[in-house]
Amino acid sequence: MNRLRRKACVALLLFTLFIFGTMMGLRTLKPTDGFSDLAPGMELMPLVGERMEQRPNHLIESAGQNGGLHSDTKIVFSNSGPDHSIFYDIHIFYYLWYGSPQMDSSYIHWDHVLVPHWDPKIAASHPKGRHNPPDDIASSYYPELGPYSSRDPEVIESHMAQIEAAAAGVVVLSWYPPGVADEHGKPSEDLVPAVMDAAHKHSIKVAFHLQPYKGRTDISVHDNIKYIIDTYGTHGAFYRFKSSTGKILPLFYVYDSYLTPPETWAELLTIRGSHSLRGTPYDGIFIALIVEERHKQDILAGGFDGMYTYFASNGFSFGSSHQNWKAIKAFCDKNNLLFVPSAGPGYMDTAVRPWNNHNTRNRVNGRYYETSLQAAMSVRPDIITITSFNEWHEGTQIERAVPKKTVARLYLDYKPHQPDHYLELTKKWAEHFSKEKEQWLM
């Protein structure tokens, strides 16, 4: 009998140790550096142990069909079918730099050069030259519309319809001043009215993504802002945002803002600046690009209202690394700045930078995109930006793409999913973001 009792005690002790060890092992597990445990289709669980103490300082304001302002974050409307929503806290970067022979007399950007590496030894081991559309384009994917022209009204209409289907409420238009373009393109500022008209038709708003150009200074940006507001400020599609002070102001993203010293930006963006926009009819919400960690202080010192991350390659920079977003958001909250994380479906620019495969981020059938969106949402931002609708060179597009094989090229595609897979994922997460925000504000 004693022997049986001893065996029972030993068995009970071993079982207890097993349970204890299992619990400790589970407790010490950490997420991997790769994808999260979010399964496709699963909703985010509420953040445990975190409560929203107050409403956010910033609420979206959008112009209605007649240009009137209201403070809802979304607009629900019927368009010859069931009700659906557009969410003005989802902003998507959009490019107008493409051209085709039919509309522009030649291909523009689809025939992009293969950019050589700055180290001649590395450059020597990679191909040179430029792409030869329509079969060979400067992208690893192939658009359903083919190598199109951004001037084609049917293309613009198709794009706005796709963005509406994705439920993204704000197109962030890559913008250069009249007569100015990037080094591989041609001026396209004259297309802005057509984009705004098409966007308005689909209840989409338009914000401006100020691109760097030769000679860009605080003074030239002052003139750029004045031009944009004077020219487009009364359009029904012109996007405005309600600031923490209650003012309803245009919102501008400033790409490569770090190229200009913070003390120079301060002349434009602080109340005591020599040619300040603050308190004038040309005031706005100005969002700077954060790439390196030190840019946080520079952005604050420059008088900006917030920061965005843009790049869709997790780990490429301090700003684009998901693991840093919580700290960036905390800095922004402390200093009354907006933090606008940028989520993307993947990254692959080897069609234009053949030596840059170490920054490639595969899409994994949409898993990378959902992980990126989850990371953005987890820091409870006011706005999430999507990189991008149609930056085909860097493989960040969510625009419809199709399988394509030529004699020289085999393009990537969205299989096993349909061409609109990333539009559908965007809509799913836009809806989820709206529902999560409602919970945060309770």
UniProtKB/Swiss-Prot annotation:
Disulfide bonds: none
Mode of membrane association: Single-pass type II membrane protein
EC numbers for this chain: 3.2.1.-
Keyword flag Repressor: no
CC per GO annotation: Golgi membrane
Topological domains, Cytoplasmic: 1-8
Enzyme kind, highest EC tier: hydrolase
Highest taxon, organism lineage: Eukaryota
Record topology, Lumenal segments: 30-442
Pfam families reported for this sequence: Glyco_hydro_99 (PF16317)
Sorted UniProt keywords: Golgi apparatus, Hydrolase, Membrane, Signal-anchor, Transmembrane, Transmembrane helix
GO molecular function: alpha-mannosidase activity
Compartment list: Golgi apparatus membrane
Membrane spanning stretches: 9-29
Keyword S-adenosyl-L-methionine: no
Family designation: Belongs to the glycosyl hydrolase 99 family.
Protein name per Swiss-Prot or TrEMBL: Glycoprotein endo-alpha-1,2-mannosidase-like protein
Organism the protein comes from: Danio rerio (Zebrafish)
Name of encoding gene: maneal
